[in-house]
């Protein structure tokens, strides 16, 4: 219990510090802010190991396409994977709910790194250009796109069906899908 609280304290303080330190990067090239995201991924990995003795095992990195566009469909069980996946994939673009951009400082960084937003609860005109944005990002930058198909954090034992958007991305864009399973919610 105490170790968990110490972990949370240092993780959140470190995350806030990294975001604040990278505020000046918001006027610099995008890649600088992307590096900040990767640092956050390594920070959470360090905190998990140092404070909780959690070792992270990643299996199947040899299946990540090297020379073609792809997208990642990942389960979403905690805040962990949103940071950690940035240490595995080459500066991914996240598809995320629009509301996250309203978070001061953090939302500014999400916007700067080129996150693709979607209004989850309603069909809006903003969502119509969704697939065009994905095509543009992947073809122009060669960055993979990460989507959380259940559209919300889900406990490991909860089986929530995937949203239709994932299959539509696969059908419309003809990109390879790299599925990611995890157990970070335990």
What are these regions (language model features)?
Residues 15-29, 34, 38, 66-123:
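Catalytic core of membrane glycerolipid acyltransferases/transacylases, capturing the structured
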Residues 111, 115-142:
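A membrane-cytosol interface segment of integral membrane proteins
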Residues 69-71, 142-148, 176:
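Residue-level preference for the first positions of well-ordered beta-strands
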Residues 106-107, 144, 155-186:
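A cross-family acyltransferase "interaction/gating" segment
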Residues 51-59, 127-129, 186:
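Short gly/ser/thr-rich secondary-structure transition/capping motifs
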Residues 76-78, 150-154:
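Short glycine-rich anion-binding loops that position phosphate/pyrophosphate groups of nucleotides
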Residues 1-55:
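N-terminal membrane-anchoring alpha-helices
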